[in-house]
Amino acid sequence: MSITKEFDTITAISTPLGEGAIGIVRLSGTDAIAIANKVFKGKNLETVDSHTINYGHIVENNEIIDEVMVSVMRAPKTFTREDVVEINTHGGVAVTNEILQLLIRSGARMAEPGEFTKRAFLNGRIDLTQAEAVMDLIRAKTDKAMTVAVSQLDGSLKNLINNTRQEILNTLAQVEVNIDYPEYDDVEEVTTNLVREKTQEFQALLENLLATAKRGKILREGLSTAIIGRPNVGKSSLLNNLLREEKAIVTDIEGTTRDVIEEYVNIKGVPLKLIDTAGIRDTDDVVEKIGVERSKKALEEADLVLLVLNSSEPLTDQDRTLLDISQNSNRIILLNKTDLPQAIQTEELPEDLIPISVLKNENIDKIEDRINQLFFDNAGLVEKDATYLSNARHISLIEKALESLEAVNQGLELGMPVDLLQVDMTRTWEILGEITGDAAPDELITQLFSQFCLGK
């Protein structure tokens, strides 16, 4: 997809393919209204008011294809800042595809993935952070993730970054003035103090923003959560309890979970990617052995480990091994089967375990409370009006910007001339511009929009 601004008219189906009540075929571009008017029988779309919905039929060679409602939106007050037409059809693969092909035959071009959002970016309707927020909103798995995405779409991150970049420019301009007009004896000291003060101010701001990354990334991507334990302690039953559906195979036979099962579940606004692992033990079964190896890998990569023990049986060597290999993880120990007489030796276990009964659904809510304690210090997940970093690209760029600011600090400590330190300060300004797209390379922008679905 070329990054250069284009003016041809594009079209795509904007709703998921399949059976449904409504389907939407979208056009955007200079000729969007004229092309739609060619295939629409009803009011003349080229003369109707902007932001109106018009009843009629889509026809080809006087044959009715569908009864539709057509939305006409004139530039610049549209998502793409171009003329936009949305044809609301009856849902279904055949009718939406037929209308799409008719529009292409009438002069439109098939849109590439993300091209509508790309045009909104190129035409200045949104910046790159807002474009990425569109995708985050589509992919949001919980209401909290949706709130963060909507805030970014509304411009919270854009405004913070743009304001910081402007302050950096103001600082650089003041330094230039002081360098160009060195009439005063103390101008060098004043300039050095200014740069030191502003650099520390920018560092504090970006460090505070970076501090939100852990929470933001969890809300966006979820916590990779490995459920581990020896065979038949209730791992799959716990998974099904959290999911509230029979996803894993639950039997009384050891080793029935032979692979890694992954599912998402919403825990108080946090998407947990639950990984039910095969029981970690020595086995001669080839298929089960593969599952065990995958389980060990899942344990290494997990953000959170739920270690399930059987409270109705004494600790085994396998239990002790699992306690040992998971001790450096963010771990919650669960004593399952508390509905049965206790036989486990709790004196060998850490104090912060949670007794549960998956069978009777007892104390499952305490798992959710412990997760909140582990990852969010019992604080609310999303603070009102707060700006969160949740995108790995943004996090990486903020870290690079902080490195450039630290280079300025180090230069000041070494007594380097301020005019030489302008290079690192300018680099900070450029890096922050990559976040919003003001200084992002074409290849990055092209790659970003290619991840979008067709019609968005």
UniProtKB/Swiss-Prot annotation:
Name the GO terms of the biological process aspect.
tRNA methylation; tRNA wobble uridine modification
Q: Gene symbol? A: mnmE
Q: Name one GO molecular function term.
A: GTPase activity
Where does the signal sequence lie? none
Q: What protein name is recorded for this chain?
A: tRNA modification GTPase MnmE
- Entries under InterPro entries matching the protein: G_TrmE, GTP-bd, GTP-bd_TrmE_N, GTPase_MnmE, MnmE_dom2, MnmE_helical, P-loop_NTPase, Small_GTP-bd
Q: Which residues form a coiled coil?
A: none
Cofactor binding: number and manner: Binds 1 potassium ion per subunit.
Keyword list, A-Z? Cytoplasm, GTP-binding, Hydrolase, Magnesium, Metal-binding, Nucleotide-binding, Potassium, tRNA processing
Enumerate the Pfam families for this protein.
MMR_HSR1 (PF01926), MnmE_helical (PF12631), TrmE_N (PF10396)
According to the entry, every stretch annotated as the TrmE-type G domain falls at 222-376
